[in-house]
């Protein structure tokens, strides 16, 4: 007669095998798209889009979609032929006809159409025009403390450092005061107390 533990182990193994077999059958199950239209599936029981295919379609039929580098399947009737009408390509731009279509030819009209920049040219004034261009490495390397972000970071870092030092000193003072009050037992008391050796005679 088998022990109850052995029977329980055997039932557990058989149940696990049946669950694994049922799951593998479910994964390879082919779903007909007509079943979806007839409403045989409930709202949360729909299969994945990858599982739904036309009748007779294998997963290999779908591998030809993508970049188009490879030639497609031999069935040419699946791909419709598109014919584009031939359009002559030239770069001829038609002339505009109308009030704004005339190009000015007289010098006075050309001067009126000129766009004059509003800023002064550096060559117009008495300013000393220098051809020296400051490199980024030399311009920033002159003094790092002239930059506002570096200066603000140093100030904030200094304030945080001072606050940390103040809190550290306050913690040390607090601990020293606690030691002075006697809250810590600094003296060692003997663990074993010697019994009195006085003898009484009657």
From Swiss-Prot:
Its main location: membrane. Residues 46-63 have a biased composition (Acidic residues). GO terms for biological process: cell migration. GO terms for cellular component: cell surface; extracellular region; membrane. Pfam families: Syndecan (PF01034). It is a single-pass type I membrane protein. Residues 23-152 are extracellular. Glycans are attached at residues 43, 65, 67. Residues 1-22 form the signal peptide. The chain crosses the membrane at residues 153-173. The keyword Transmembrane applies. It comes from the Eukaryota. InterPro entries: Neurexin-like (IPR003585), Syndecan (IPR001050), Syndecan/Neurexin_dom (IPR027789), Syndecan_CS (IPR030479). Shedding, cleavage of the extracellular domain to release a soluble form, is enhanced by a number of factors such as heparanase, growth factor receptor action for example by thrombin or EGF. Physiological events such as stress or wound healing can activate the shedding. PMA-mediated shedding is inhibited by TIMP3. It is found in: Membrane; Secreted. The keyword Transmembrane helix applies. Residues 174-202 are cytoplasmic. Cell surface proteoglycan which regulates exosome biogenesis in concert with SDCBP and PDCD6IP. Homodimer. Interacts with CDCP1 and SDCBP. Interacts (via its cytoplasmic domain) with GIPC (via its PDZ domain). Interacts (via its cytoplasmic domain) with NUDT16L1. Interacts with DNM2; this interaction is markedly enhanced at focal ahesion site upon induction of focal adhesions and stress-fiber formation. Belongs to the syndecan proteoglycan family. This is Syndecan-4. It comes from Sus scrofa (Pig). The gene is SDC4.
